[in-house]
C-alpha cells in the first residue's frame, strides 16, 4: 500500500463505497478532491489543485486547473476551466472556456459593479455564481464575474461583471431576466 492509500484510509472507512465515477482514460495529477457521485469522464484532464463537488460532471476532453467546482457543476464537453470557481449547479456548454491569462500578459484587474480590484497576478479565470448557464462556444475572459441565476448566450466573449439574474446576449447587451 502506498502513502496516498494510507492517507485515504485514515480519512475513510475503505469498506464503504466512495462513489465517484472516474473513467479509465481520465488523468488526475492532483492534489484533487473528487466528491461523491461526481463523474470524471473519458479523457478528462485534471491538474493543479482541484476540488470537484458532489454530483459534478467533468466531461469528455475537459481540462481543469486550479479550480473549485461546487456540487452539481457540469463542464461536460470539451471545456477548459482554469484558475476559476464555479458555483452550485453552474453549467458550461460544449466548448466554452474560462480564459485565465490576458493576451498581453499584463496583471489582471477584476471589474466589479462599484470598483475595480487589481489582483497583482497574471492568472485568474472566471467566477460563476450558482445556477449560471454558459452557452456553447463562449469565452469567459480573465477575471470575469457572472452573478447567480444568469445566462450567457452561445458564442459570447464575456468580460467584466454580469449582475445576478441577467441574460448576456452580446457585448453591451445585458438584460434582466423576467
Specify the residue positions occupied by each region the protein language model found:
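Extended, small-residue-rich solenoid/repeat segments and analogous flexible loops
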Residues: 1-45, 49
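The repeat-register position in solenoid repeat domains
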Residues: 24, 36, 53-54, 65, ...
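Short, functional N-terminal and low-complexity linear motifs
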Residues: 4-9, 22-24, 54-60, 99, ...
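Transmembrane beta-barrel architecture of outer membranes
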Residues: 41, 47, 51-53, 59, ...
